[in-house]
Amino acid sequence: SVCPDLYTYNTGTLLQAAVALYNYTGEQAYLDNAKFLAEGSYKVFFKYTEDGIPYIADLPWFNLVLFRGYHDLYNVTGDSKYVDTMIKGLDYAWEHARDQAGLMYHDWTGRTDEKRKPKWLLDASCVPEYYARVAMIKGEVTNRKNK
């Protein structure tokens, strides 16, 4: 039987692969597939709080894999829709969903108080890569591979 569960890292992996194949071959079909995956994942995974803050109800590290795919697609198309949405949620979490040690909560909406809850590696260890990618997207740092 087929498992009906949907995970952001699966889509992110396929999205990254589609962009990589487009970059290597120049075949439009791969870019079209990447755009299809990006828009489909955007519609399926993103939810919004009452205040309009975007979030994805999955593990933050799993969401990072999707963000990698969005970042790769952004580098090709220049369309910031997907990366901007994730950055908005990330920045909100940075301000509203961290404990006294600065570690991010599992729930990036800040709707649950996780200050005293032990943190899980998959929730906290992804944050530096998120912000490294944000810095690349904003042009604050360069990716040495792309020089």
Task: Go through the PLM ranges and name each one.
Residues 21-28:
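Inter-helical turn/loop segments and adjacent helix faces that build the functional surface
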Residues 6, 31-147:
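CBM-like carbohydrate-recognition segments
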Residues 17-20, 69:
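"A position-specific structural signal for the A-helix of alpha-solenoid helical repeats
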Residues 1-17, 60-64:
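Structured, solvent-exposed acidic/aromatic patches
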